[in-house]
């Protein structure tokens, strides 16, 4: 039995779960998410808990059991509390700002980079160098944060660029010259 898959999911009071065959719909104060689960797993609701079970013991079912449980748990957590991803901008002259709903990045290019948020995603900027991506769908929050980071990933020599909060960038030593010009 999958150690992750057999753990029950606690549903908060303000969250409503509807199960229709393989489709799971979760509604909460932050929004509504729905997902079609594989036919190898089934979800049952007992009071304030959800239980994900697999139909048989095939290898595919065992693989999808823990995944499906985690996906449903992320849906429940997303509509009740939401998710956020923090990014840090390092480098002279590199900064971010929010204009309307869009994120404007000045990253040393000849133009500003404008990022439009998908539905359900909000941007916030602190001190022009910290970007917060928040929303109720964990997958979309992570993908949006990855797109922002891809605008200027941290480089290994000076560490300039956009990185996730707490990300450690491996640094490289620069060239060791022979002495320089005289």
UniProtKB/Swiss-Prot annotation:
Coiled coil: none annotated. GO terms for biological process: cytoplasmic translation. GO terms for cellular component: cytosolic large ribosomal subunit. InterPro entries: Ribosomal_uL6-like, Ribosomal_uL6-like_a/b-dom_sf, Ribosomal_uL6_a/b-dom, Ribosomal_uL6_bac-type, Ribosomal_uL6_CS. GO terms for molecular function: rRNA binding; structural constituent of ribosome. PANTHER family: 60S/50S RIBOSOMAL PROTEIN L6/L9, LARGE RIBOSOMAL SUBUNIT PROTEIN UL6M. Belongs to the universal ribosomal protein uL6 family. HAMAP family: Ribosomal_uL6_B. This is Large ribosomal subunit protein uL6. The lineage of its organism: Bacteria, Bacillati, Cyanobacteriota, Cyanophyceae, Nostocales.
